């Protein structure tokens, strides 16, 4: 865990996790892996665009700008824009996902959905979260989870 992360941010993430029935240590580990606690982390995923978003754009469902922003991961948990839209995110700009309360709400909502679909198998849920791009992703995140497991939720 980075020593420079504000305690308030860690506590807020732990609170949001608990409010979604998630292990706070797991959400903190995902955040550390995905963004290193950078609230403004943004990454374009060209493979995601081609596979998931381009067919919707081609069908005229939304603009090119929306297509590209849906193909980006945003904020602390690196929530994919398309996943946020599918989960009910209706704000005009996906950059709002960089605001910790909003990004953590949608990130926790999506992660909880993956865990439910995987019938509680956290490793499988983490692979779904990551899109299977990194085969040892679950192992990495679960290793990071140990750094946060001994900290009680305040």
Regions found by a protein language model. Give the residues of each.
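Catalytic glycan-binding domains that act on GlcNAc-containing polysaccharides
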Residues: 2-154
